[in-house]
Amino acid sequence: MKLCDFEVGLDKPFFLIAGTCVIESEQMAIDTAGTLKEITGALGIPFIYKSSFDKANRSSDASFRGLGMEEGLRILSEVRRQVGVPVLTDIHEIDEIKPVAEVVDVLQTPAFLCRQTDFIRACAQSGKPVNIKKGQFLAPHDMKNVIDKARHAARDAGLPEDNFMACERGASFGYNNLVSDMRSLAIMRETGAPVVFDATHSVQLPGGQGTSSGGQREFVPVLARAAIAVGVAGVFMETHPDPACAKSDGPNAVPLRRMKDLLSVLKELDALTKRSGFLENQFD
């Protein structure tokens, strides 16, 4: 699959989607994107900057949702222009798709909306690559139906059918908890779409702090290493200069100062995994 200006797949080095959970300010977005560009450039990791203009699924109505679509898109446009990196953001409503697609390089669908057929079809017909997150409630093999919906919609619109990624972000495991079943990464390959592992939302404790979600960021490196060992096309991670002060999802964000060390390890593991091949393909 061609994504932005690079090829992605199990025969290519992993790419990174990373940034702050929500856009907090223009300066933070530019600084964070710049730091990540420097790190990934030195390591040779293809990079897409990610941040949200609206967090529509916050636990509490009192929580910070974001700067809104107009201001958020302006800031993402500035990140793209000043830092020179492709940008990704998520959309929550069909009406948001057209204006957002005019600014960003990649769209992302929230996990909660993966079964909304009209929404998935509309995103697929935007002409942009789409990172489709698997719902916490969905079996990994059910993602084939979701990806097929997107492909059929693209075909109906005369657009490429290979513009979609399947993203794993953990599965509900009782109340206020998620678990990552690493088998799902191999199972989701059956969709034919590049598989992305969301290493930070996978350690989230949804609603675990009462009016906000908790998280266990110390397990991000653990799960990220495991996913790379299984074999994925890309890794998604949210990061923040000061997670304790983040306005959204701070408990599961990677401290920005730790990203270089983590990505260095993942790069080495990725090369080993893909050089060794995938023996599971011969276990039929």
From Swiss-Prot:
Family matches, as HAMAP family: KDO8P_synth
Superkingdom of origin organism: Bacteria
Cellular component GO terms, alphabetical: cytoplasm
Listed GO MF terms: 3-deoxy-8-phosphooctulonate synthase activity
Protein EC: 2.5.1.55
NCBIfam families: KDO8P_synth, PRK05198.1
Organism: Ralstonia pickettii (strain 12J)
Enzymatic class: transferase
Family stated for the protein in its record: Belongs to the KdsA family.
InterPro entries for this protein: Aldolase_TIM, DAHP1/KDSA, KDO8P_synthase
Reaction it catalyzes: D-arabinose 5-phosphate + phosphoenolpyruvate + H2O = 3-deoxy-alpha-D-manno-2-octulosonate-8-phosphate + phosphate
Intracellular or extracellular location(s): Cytoplasm
Taxonomic lineage of the native organism: Bacteria, Pseudomonadati, Pseudomonadota, Betaproteobacteria, Burkholderiales
PANTHER family according to UniProt: PHOSPHO-2-DEHYDRO-3-DEOXYHEPTONATE ALDOLASE (PTHR21057)
Keywords: Cytoplasm, Lipopolysaccharide biosynthesis, Transferase
Pathway assignment: Carbohydrate biosynthesis; 3-deoxy-D-manno-octulosonate biosynthesis; 3-deoxy-D-manno-octulosonate from D-ribulose 5-phosphate: step 2/3; Bacterial outer membrane biogenesis; lipopolysaccharide biosynthesis
GO biological process: keto-3-deoxy-D-manno-octulosonic acid biosynthetic process
The UniProt record lists the keyword Cytoplasm: yes
Protein name (record): 2-dehydro-3-deoxyphosphooctonate aldolase
